[in-house]
Amino acid sequence: MLITCPYCGPRDVIEFTYQGDGNRERPEPASQNFEAWNAYVYDRLNPAGDHNEIWQHSGGCRSHLRVVRNTLTHEISSVAFARGDHGPRRKMEGKS
Amino acid sequence: MVERLSPLEPDFHPGSHGNFEHGVDVILTETRPGSIVQLAAWPGEEKKLIAAIRAVTGLALPDGAGGGISSGGKSVFGFAPGKFTVADDAEGLAEAFAKAVGPAIGTVTDLSHGRTVIRIAGPKAEWVLAKFFAIDFALPAFPVGSGRSTAHHDVFAQIHRSGTDQFDIHVFRSFARSFWKALCHASEEVGYEVQ
Ligand SMILES: [Zn+2]
């Protein structure tokens, strides 16, 4: 499986670390809403198809990335910096 | 000034090794720069940091991810968004950057004693490195001057292409001897000379 890092270009999955489900919303640290905390810790969509995920290019530029991966085919349909657009991007053949 | 010791020393054997009967196809050496610093810009401050790099080193960074340049014993390359590695044959880079990069622009980390730079040069340099790293070493994908961040068996490496057939590999000092030995083994096939 290859993940195309917006900075480094296509790299083998071995350079990346999975940082978890990208759909989770972390409650405010002081929040006493236990249902929200429970949902953050335990509730997962577990889709058979496209899934929003957070990965880190830990064996490369170390950027945190927002990745959409198909759980059935491993096809990756989008990769973006988790913190929004910043810095220069590698020019990809046929892709922007 | 205290003399810096090389972490490669017990396994650094100058001379020709491996299958060199028909000549050596790579030369391995340690470049031992006097200073290595890592610079990081806060988001939005990248242009100011690039201007500071130019003011301190005289080097103008080319645009684009991983862009870099070397000249006059100094080199700089991008290794992550808004982050750059600068090396200089002379000491004193960290002090110069500490003056030029204020806390509103970003950070300066002195790695002069924390990294070891191993140079591999020669017609088979790409061939040998391709055994280690799953990245494209072809010139159009990895132009002269540019840098790449990658890893070999969890040994993080920043690779700076300092010539068409020449690469400078920045590794953690504590992993340098292990990496060096692996690089020597991988070079036996093509014949190598340690200088
Ligand atoms: Zn990356």
Where are these regions (language model features)?
Chain B
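Basic, glycine/lysine-rich polyanion-binding surfaces/domains
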Residues: 1-195
